[in-house]
Amino acid sequence: LCQFLEARQKSDLEPQLGSAFDLHGAGFSFCSSANMAKTTRTGLIAFEDGTIFRGRAFGAVATNVGEACFNTSMTGYQEILTDPSYFSQIVTMTAVQIGNYGICPDDVESDGPKVKGFIVREISPVASNWRSNTSIQDYLAEAGIPGIEGVDTRAITKKLRVSGALKACITTEDISEEEAVKRAQEFGGLIGVDFVKEVTAKAAYHWDPEMEQSTPFTVVGTDLRLNEDKTPKPRFKVAAMDFGAKFSIYRKLQHHGFDVHVFPATTSAAEIKAFKPDCVFLSNGPGDPGAVDYAHATVKELIEEYPTFGICLGHQIITHALGAKTFKLKFGHRGGNQPVKNLETGKVSITAQNHGFASTREELEKAGAIVTEINLNDETVEGLRLKDKPVFSVQYHPEAAPGPNDADPLFVDFYNMVAKHVG
């Protein structure tokens, strides 16, 4: 393989790629030669301030607008692409090379890519993974998502860090720089826009109890649905409100002893109550938490009656349900290396995060909530619980996917809280 890649780097084997060398027998899975060759198409990303970055195009021939952001994860690009929280965003990866393990159908976080565009330093010319069935190039092309490689992703990241999140236009079509800048400026942004309705479930459904068995690499370790003597634990019926949930969260809930029933974001409190759940879960999702006011009213009513756990947007919706507010971060927290301190235990965890809004600490405390965790980078709120109700939430992603598993015990905490409440 090393000799193969060395020769590929020298361009000596470009015409033969995927045909003259058959390394499948050695455990390598390569995409076709047509997809591995570097494209001659060009593309660009234009920011609202007129800044232009040009590079090589991959993925779909298309033009999209959205908010530009960056993610510092080294791996997990497939989970990032399919995370509904990225709906309406153009994502830049800070890792140098992306795509080297292809796309695996078992690792998706939704029914397809949700990003508006994807920007990387380099797309790997080889996708080597026995579990993958396609390359990232083909995957994005089929989904209609444009991508650009060969750009200075470090410069883009530094720009967003200094300027804050910017509206942008990504194109792999033949349009002028002036037109691209104009389209970026015309994008409405995220504030005040309800993107949840674009990604929530269309109807209520029962999470497939066999789903976990069909994804053996998602959950590792002891079966937490069993007691120490291997007898089954009680399974609690959870009403999961889908604001744009990642599949990994449902898998984690199931793995930790919950019978997961998913409901669209617009489901009323009366409909949830008629289902008679043991508890409520509030998922992640895209956009401005202040724009989903219908969910604020629903959750305000539900937390009066049911043990509730919220993640990411779900955490922010609890904030609004309590009468507190959220605000937009300068450039957000996106990556698998965010340090979070638990103010009650003093413990620091490294967490996976993906959010552009945060809860206002002063207003939460005035509303009677206890702020339990903060981000050590900027001291924004990362967790809360209520003093007199079985309700807690976190801003980060304890299910990871991708990222560290430091916060996985939160699912155990949720189970134990429900068990105590149900009696």
Task: Specify the residue positions occupied by each region the protein language model found.
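Short hydrophobic targeting helices and cationic amphipathic motifs
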Residues: 3-5, 13, 23
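Residue-identity detector for glycine
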Residues: 18, 25-27
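RNA-binding accessory domains that recognize and position tRNA/RNA substrates
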Residues: 37-239, 243-270, 274-275, 289, ...
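Glycine-rich phosphate/pyrophosphate-binding beta-alpha loops
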Residues: 74, 354-359, 396-403
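Residues that mark the start of a beta-strand
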Residues: 235-239, 259, 307, 350, ...
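Cysteine-nucleophile active-site neighborhood
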Residues: 274, 278-279, 283-350, 356-358, ...
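Catalytic beta-strand/loop cores that center a nucleophilic Ser/Cys/Thr
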Residues: 346-389
